Each structure stands twice: as structure tokens, then as C-alpha cells.
């Protein structure tokens, strides 16, 4: 009887450990299409006062990221800042510009996903002054992305991908950064689901990643 009770306790502990280690990565999208995903969508998105669509509760990039995950069956992970950016548009601009100028590496909230089993990473972010938000670099520098294929996508208000793909390629020469990234206006991502889906479909097809 003692042996059985001990075994049950050990099994429960193992189950709890496995559950806790996976809690930061949402695998619901991949489970709808296949049992194991070989790709993950990693994104940073900002909420609050937006340049073109007012106050938003779900970021523009988040909306695109979820479409990509649903269409590819990829797992999904959101990069969240330990110290949230201001909700005010002007205040957020001031903070983000200073981070860019200082090449800051903002702290990320929570644990990062283990990318070992993901050869493909869809990387999403808003284009802030021609570059990725500095917190995206924080994530990449803390993750092992050597040899991985990085597929960038971004939201913007007129500047497209800017220099983001080239900057990523230069900063992480050990990874395979795809220069043919997806760029979508934030207002489109926020207000036009059909156009967003169409743009994602076209991009995935160009990469040979459509289902």
C-alpha cells in the first residue's frame, strides 16, 4: 500500500511539473490541426491609445499573430514587458524612442518558451521608427535561435517593414531571417479581418507555408 501511495504522489508531482512548464505557450491553435507543431508564432503587441484607430484593447500585431497561428497550426507566445509601456500614445512614443536611442533591452515578464523543438519562428511586432521594439531584441538575445528560420511580420502606419528584417538579419547572423516579411497597416489589422486574412494567406503561400 505504501508503494502504491508513493507512486501516486510521484506521478502527481511529474504531472504538475509538466503542466507548469508549458503554461506560457498556447498550443490550442496547433492542436486543431496536428498533434505536434514545428513552428511557433512569437509576437509583441501594444494596446492602449493607437495612432490611427483610437484606444484598443487588443494590439494590431496580436490580431495578425492569431490569424497566422490559426492558419499554420503553430503554437503561439506573446512577449509581455515586465514594466508595461504607457497607454497614452505620446507617453509610449517617448519611452520607445528613448529605448531605441539607448539600445535598451527591456525586461520580459514571465518565463520564455523553449524553442528547441521549433525550427520555424514567426516573429511579429509593430514597426517603431524603422526597427523592432527593443523588447523583441530582449527576447531573441535570451533565446537560442541559431539555425532557426525567422519569418518576420509587422504592423505599421505607412512605413512597411522598414529596416526591421535587415536589422534582424544583421543582429542574428546565426539565424535564417527571411527578408520577405509580411507588413500590414495597423488600421487594417484592427478593423478589416477579411483583408488581414487575405494578406496572411498571400504571404504564407509565397513562403510555401499554407496548409
Q: For each of these PLM feature ranges, what is it?
A:
Residues 194-196:
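Post-His helix in hydrolase/transferase enzymes
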Residues 75-76, 175-185:
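Short beta-strand elements in bilobed, periplasmic/extracellular small-molecule ligand-binding domains
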Residues 64-71, 75, 124, 138-143, ...:
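Structured segments of extracytoplasmic/periplasmic soluble domains
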Residues 21-118, 130, 198-211:
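N-terminal beta1-alpha1-beta2 submodule of the flavodoxin-like/Rossmannoid cofactor-binding fold
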Residues 87-174:
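Helix-loop-strand module that forms the ligand-binding subsite of alpha/beta enzymes
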Residues 1-8:
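Bacterial N-terminal signal peptides that target proteins for export
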Amino acid at each position: 500500500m505504501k508503494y502504491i501511495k508513493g507512486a501516486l504522489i510521484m506521478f502527481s508531482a511529474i504531472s504538475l511539473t509538466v503542466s507548469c512548464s508549458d503554461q506560457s505557450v498556447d498550443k490550442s491553435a496547433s492542436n486543431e490541426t496536428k498533434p505536434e507543431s514545428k513552428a511557433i508564432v512569437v509576437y509583441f503587441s501594444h494596446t492602449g491609445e493607437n495612432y490611427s484607430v483610437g484606444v484598443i484593447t487588443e494590439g494590431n500585431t496580436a490580431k495578425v499573430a492569431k490569424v497566422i497561428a490559426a492558419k499554420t497550426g503553430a503554437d503561439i507566445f506573446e512577449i509581455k514587458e515586465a514594466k508595461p509601456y504607457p497607454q497614452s500614445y505620446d507617453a509610449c512614443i517617448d519611452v520607445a524612442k528613448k529605448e531605441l536611442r539607448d539600445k535598451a533591452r527591456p525586461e520580459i515578464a514571465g518565463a520564455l518558451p523553449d524553442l528547441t523543438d521549433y525550427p520555424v519562428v514567426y516573429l511579429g511586432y509593430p514597426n517603431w521608427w524603422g526597427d523592432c521594439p527593443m523588447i523583441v531584441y530582449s527576447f531573441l538575445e535570451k533565446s537560442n535561435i541559431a539555425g532557426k528560420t525567422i519569418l518576420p511580420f509587422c504592423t505599421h502606419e505607412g512605413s512597411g517593414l522598414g529596416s526591421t528584417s535587415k536589422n534582424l538579419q544583421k543582429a542574428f547572423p546565426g539565424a535564417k531571417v527571411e527578408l520577405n516579411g509580411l507588413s500590414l497597416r495597423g488600421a487594417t489589422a484592427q478593423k478589416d479581418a477579411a483583408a488581414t486574412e487575405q494578406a496572411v494567406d498571400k504571404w504564407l503561400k509565397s513562403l510555401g507555408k499554407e496548409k
